[in-house]
Amino acid sequence: IEYMHTHNKCLVNQRELGADTQSFGNALRGALRQDPDVILVGEMRDKETIEIALRAAETGHLVLSTLHTVGAVNTMDRIIDVFPAEQQEQIRVQLSAVMEGVVSQQLMRTATGKGRVAAFEIMLGTPAIRNLIREGKTHQLLTPIQTGAQLGMITMDTSLMGLYRRNVIDQRTLLSYS
């Protein structure tokens, strides 16, 4: 367990791999038996974990997770590509129905070299986004992200350019991350 949550205004039940459970899948199944409102999966690393997380989201649970990807498009593709080709259409349908949003971040050195700053990509589950995922057109997701700025969406490149224009990162960093 990386961080021990304390019980303030809610109950937090944590499971540690190896000590409390043998796999993310077992931990998720156990969590679902306790009727949680929110489930935080440290990382969706395998097919079993993703399947159970999707099922949990379909039954009304808010599921939050991490994935080591850069950008919303890569995140969607990584989730879908974990499954064999014959299951991918079903997964796209499930994912399009339950995905509320993706926040992708990249940490980079500041222009001063003192500290780091995050550039973000934010994609929300709008009808256009959901349709593209369902239809297997994830390569087209950047267009509705770009046009969805008024909803709070932003592409990684736009975020990087904003950091550059405010002199938070230098040109070399901008080019290496865009």
Language-model-detected regions and their locations in the chain:
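Short, flexible helix-loop junctions that flank or precede catalytic/ligand sites
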Residues: 1-178
